[in-house]
Amino acid sequence: YGTLVIDPKGGRPKADEMVMVQGGYNTTFDGQGNELYFVNGVPFAYMDRPIRVKKDQLVRIYLTNILEYDPINSFHLHGNFFEYYPTGTRLEPSEFTDTISQVQGQRGILEMRFPFTGRYMFHAHKTEFAELGWMGFFEVVQ
């Protein structure tokens, strides 16, 4: 899985950029739904190995939802807000929030700065998804 990023002609402000692909696995192949959920292919990966970012640095996330069986996915950030650019086709954000929802195949750009060091949890805002792997941490350092 991956994401194709096309920047606008003038570019975007310099940032620590990353791609997050949201999805799930149906491990029984029964067509009844997912048993595991993830960001970037591995359930719970960022719980044990948080994503390190620098305090006050602009962080840009290209977020893509490829989840099957479940029509809606979400991204929620604890302790901080972000600017959200749906589909990434505009240069001005549509929201300043801590939670967004995406339907299947939807994508968007999140931009944030962390004013304090420490760990900030992120996860799907559906408890089942979070409990089955779709959660992690940002580790904010000096």
Enumerate the language-model features and the residues they cover.
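Copper-binding active sites and cupredoxin-like electron-transfer domains
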Residues: 1-142
